[in-house]
């Protein structure tokens, strides 16, 4: 590939990496697609529930005949048709307190594309506990948000949102082009983390207003009293202080 700082070593890092993707929809599914075509060796796709017709405006991995069926299985089928060499594990379930630790331990990093804060908080806490990087991506309407979390280095999700925003169980409105835009940036952050070829978005929140096509970055700071990643957080005692971020992810 003729891209500065992206050579054979970077491609090998992608091949040896395992990425956990939560929420295989317009955001997570599209991000998974770009990781698959980039050459990531293994994906763990996590999403409960079945595909609905009103999901289809943003589902690039799905087909109409799959409505009413578990989307993770169709996602695997589509991704492996595009990249037959990729390994894909499918979990037809949501992120729960029972499964989150084993899932995070099985991956080198996570993409948080879940559709509610309950799952997001569980994933954030587990990534902090096990020192796994996480790309945090969210959207609502024509707005999108992105940051990359490195436990012990950057603020975690709980630092950024100590009080959780209201969540409408009916879901939220979004155009497929919005979720696709954010998904590409999410996949790019993951590729940066895995390969180290470029600086990821650390301790900064990228906000995107796609109505006005305005992109802005806001500096983020760790909360030393954060119950998840702060100085007195339980993970500091549950895990060895010498634990390092996965060798398959690199950052400066």
Swiss-Prot record:
Question: One MF term in GO for this entry?
Answer: nucleotidyltransferase activity
Q: Report which superkingdom the organism of origin falls in.
A: Bacteria
Q: Which GO terms describe its cellular component?
A: cytoplasm
Signal peptide annotation: none
**Which keywords has UniProt assigned to this entry?**
Nitrogen fixation
Asked whether the UniProt record includes Lipid biosynthesis among its keywords, one would answer no
Q: Which CDD domains match?
A: ThiF_MoeB_HesA_family
What InterPro entries does the entry give?
A: ThiF/MoeB/HesA (IPR045886), ThiF_NAD_FAD-bd (IPR000594), Ubiquitin-activating_enz (IPR035985)
Q: Which Pfam families does the protein's record reference?
A: ThiF
Q: Name one GO biological process term.
A: nitrogen fixation
| Family as reported in the entry's similarity comment | Belongs to the HesA/MoeB/ThiF family.
Q: What does this protein do?
A: May be required for efficient nitrogen fixation.
**Protein name in the entry:** Protein HesA
Look up and give the organism this protein is from: Nostoc sp. (strain PCC 7120 / SAG 25.82 / UTEX 2576)
- Gene (name only): hesA
